[in-house]
Swiss-Prot record:
Record has ATP-binding as a keyword: no
Species the sequence originates in: Agelenopsis aperta
Post-translational modification, as annotated: Proteolytically processed to yield the major and the minor chains.
Primary role: Omega-agatoxins are antagonists of voltage-gated calcium channels. They block insect neuromuscular transmission presynaptically. This toxin is a blocker of L-type calcium channels (Cav/CACNA1).
Phylogenetic lineage: Eukaryota, Metazoa, Ecdysozoa, Arthropoda, Chelicerata
Prodomain positions: 20-36, 103-109
UniProt GO cellular component terms: extracellular region; host cell presynaptic membrane
Pfam hit, one: Toxin_34
Name of the protein described by the UniProt record: Omega-agatoxin-1A
Amino acid sequence: MMKFVVFLACLFVAAHSFAVEGEEEYFEAEVPELERAKALPPGSVCDGNESDCKCYGKWHKCRCPWKWHFTGEGPCTCEKGMKHTCITKLHCPNKAEWGLDWRSEESERSPC
């Protein structure tokens, strides 16, 4: 009986280790290539259909002219946003690229 319990425990550990290894590969593939690319500096042209993570820093987002949503005219640029921008960019995969200054002010209380 004891050998059977040990065998089941080993089988469970082996199955769990393969499942965890597969999840890591899944999470790496989940991040789109464009979000892993270098961040754009403030004022540069960006694509309004993509994530704001491509704009450098926690406060900058890709802002488009109001008529862009209807006609697609005019370039979108990386411009300073508001606190909501910072909150949504907390989970960006490329925030390590921004350096330590991405959390410089209010570092003891909140990252935003």
